[in-house]
C-alpha cells in the first residue's frame, strides 16, 4: 500500500496537494479494511471456538477481549488522525521547537507499545485456543508455537489453519470430505 504511494510519488513529477490528500484518504481506508478482516479472523477463532474448549480448561476470555480492543481502538484512532492530518493544510516546514511533536511522541510511544503487546497477546490467545480445541487438553506454548507463527504470518498461515478450523467447527474429518 505504501509502496504504491512511494512508486507514484517517485515516478510522477506533478505531485500536487490534491493527489496527496486523496492518498491521505485511500491509504487509511485500505488499512482499515485489512485491519477489520484480520482482527475479525482473530475474533472469530478466539471467541467462536470457545464452545469447543473442554470444560477442564479455563481460558481467560475477558483478558483477551481487553487486549484485543486496545490495538483495535489504537489503530483505528491512529488512521483517523492520519487521515485528518493528511487532509489539513499543514506547513511544509513545521516548527520543530514547538511542544506538539514531543507531546505527541510521549503519548504515542507508550500507546504504541501497549498496542503491540495487545496484538501479540491476541496472537497468543488465538493460537492457544486453536490448539486447545485440537488437542482437547491444557496446552503450553511449546504445543502451539507453530500455530502462533502461522497466525502471525497470516498470509501463509490462513491457508493451513483455516481448513482445520472449518473441520473443527463442522466435526467432520477432512479426509471424509474427499472420499
Residue ranges and their predicted role:
Residues 13-20, 51-63, 134-138:
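Membrane-interface helix-boundary motifs at transmembrane edges
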Residues 45-75:
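Alpha-helical transmembrane segments with an aromatic anchor "belt"
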Residues 35-36, 143-164:
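Hydrophobic, aromatic-rich membrane-embedded alpha-helical segments
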Residues 75-79, 104-148, 161:
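Feature detects long, helix-prone N-terminal segments enriched in hydrophobes
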Residues 45-57, 127-136, 167-173:
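Cytoplasmic membrane-interface regions of multi-pass membrane proteins
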Residues 2-35, 75-117:
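Membrane-helix interface segments in multi-pass membrane proteins
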Residues 13-18, 167-179:
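Low-complexity, intrinsically disordered extramembrane tails and loops of integral membrane proteins
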Residues 36-51, 122-128, 161-162:
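Membrane-water interface of transmembrane alpha-helices
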Amino acid at each position: 500500500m505504501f509502496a504504491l504511494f512511494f512508486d507514484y510519488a517517485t515516478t510522477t513529477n506533478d505531485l500536487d496537494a490534491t493527489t496527496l490528500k486523496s492518498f491521505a484518504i485511500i491509504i487509511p481506508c485500505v488499512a482499515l479494511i485489512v485491519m477489520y478482516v484480520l482482527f475479525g479472523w482473530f475474533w472469530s477463532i478466539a471467541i467462536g471456538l470457545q464452545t469447543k474448549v473442554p470444560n477442564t480448561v479455563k481460558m481467560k476470555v475477558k483478558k483477551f477481549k481487553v487486549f484485543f480492543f486496545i490495538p483495535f481502538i489504537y489503530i483505528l484512532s491512529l488512521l483517523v488522525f492520519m487521515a485528518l492530518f493528511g487532509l489539513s493544510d499543514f506547513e511544509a516546514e513545521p516548527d520543530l521547537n514547538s511542544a506538539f511533536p514531543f507531546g505527541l511522541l510521549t503519548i504515542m510511544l507508550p500507546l504504541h507499545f501497549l498496542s503491540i503487546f495487545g496484538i501479540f497477546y491476541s496472537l497468543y490467545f488465538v493460537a492457544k485456543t486453536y490448539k486447545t480445541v485440537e488437542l482437547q487438553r491444557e496446552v503450553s506454548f511449546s504445543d502451539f508455537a507453530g500455530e502462533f507463527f502461522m497466525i502471525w504470518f497470516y498470509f501463509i498461515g490462513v491457508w493451513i489453519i483455516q481448513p482445520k478450523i472449518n473441520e473443527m467447527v463442522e466435526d467432520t474429518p477432512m479426509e471424509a470430505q474427499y472420499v
